[in-house]
């Protein structure tokens, strides 16, 4: 998953990512709402069932980011393929291709849980005018996207 922020100036900046192989979704004792600890044990691996929604909790790695008034938050769910400049993953071969659906309705809800810190001061009141001013935080034009069901 990739978390990005839509800025008030119409740009979108990368915030942070999280990775989970869905077959390794079993969480261990000691997990919390903000920190799902996965067992990653071979005996706990379980393929995704066909035509059924299951919970897969993905940790978004620690970060600090100021969300200013007028900003948006976007969570993109994707397979870990060649969408990273420096990191790639060896994906299991899927002879018939692979698709996944993310529930986003009352009967199959999804949620994004983020920690919040109040009372922090000292950060600029506006975003940097140079979209790529923050190191390792690429930025681009924000493109509106609407979730649609797979056909």
Give the ranges of each region predicted by the language model.
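Glycine/threonine-rich phosphate-binding loop and adjacent beta-strand/alpha-helix elements that clamp
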Residues: 1-151
């Amino acid at each position: 998953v990739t978390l990005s922020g839509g800025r008030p100036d119409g740009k979108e900046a990368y915030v942070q990512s999280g990775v989970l192989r869905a077959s390794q979704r079993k969480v261990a004792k000691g997990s919390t709402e903000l920190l799902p600890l996965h067992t990653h044990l071979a005996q706990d691996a379980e393929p995704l069932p066909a035509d059924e929604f299951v919970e897969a909790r993905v940790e978004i790695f620690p970060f600090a980011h100021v969300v200013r008034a007028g900003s948006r938050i976007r969570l993109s769910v994707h397979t870990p393929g060649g969408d990273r400049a420096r990191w790639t993953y060896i994906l299991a071969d899927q002879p018939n291709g692979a698709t996944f659906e993310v529930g986003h309705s009352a009967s199959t809800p999804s949620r994004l849980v983020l920690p919040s810190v109040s009372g922090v001061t000292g950060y600029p009141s506006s975003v940097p005018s140079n979209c790529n001013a923050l190191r390792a935080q690429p930025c681009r034009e924000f493109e509106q996207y609407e979730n649609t069901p797979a056909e």
